[in-house]
Amino acid sequence: FSLTGTAAFAAEIKYSDIVIGDGELSETGENAASDNVKVIQAAFDEAKNKARDKNRYRIYFPKGEYHINTTLNIFSNTELYLDEKTTLVQDAPKGQNIVKAGDFSQKHILYNGFRNIKIDGGKWDMQFNGSCAMRFGHCTNLSIRNVNITNIMDAHHIEAAAVDTLSI
């Protein structure tokens, strides 16, 4: 992926962009789902390690259909942008979301867990695995926009609990 930096005018927030390029994610192949998880989670982990309240990370996905086989963990001060022609497909069995806030082995109370997370766009296909597509708990400032969540069975599309300032 590539990394660039830009500045925003509102509240002096700066942004660093991670653009996952064409060819970095696999649409087909025996190991496509696990390879895709590695690429995407590496971008999320870079944001986890470097993003701050005034230096946030924006991650962009290319157009295409990309399978994953485990839950992706997004962290504070990260914005995820998917084109309307981008689809994430969860191949894992029940118990795996497509994305959730952080690592739930971390214990949080009230709203002190994760903050400033935005997800914008894309199609999110759960393939009827019995889990929710997105899961967030103990967050502040969560925004989810322009998403199309499909093929949910016996679960919520989005699960958000103990979230202060939620916009869907």
Region locations from a protein language model:
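Glycine- and acidic/polar-rich repeat regions and solenoidal domains
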Residues: 95-114, 124-136, 150-160, 165-167
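Right-handed parallel beta-helix/beta-solenoid
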Residues: 10-41
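Internal alpha-helical scaffold/solenoid segments in large eukaryotic proteins
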Residues: 62, 78, 142, 150-157
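Short, T/G/N/S-enriched strand-turn elements that build extracellular solenoid repeat scaffolds
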Residues: 41-50, 67-76, 91-92, 107-111, ...
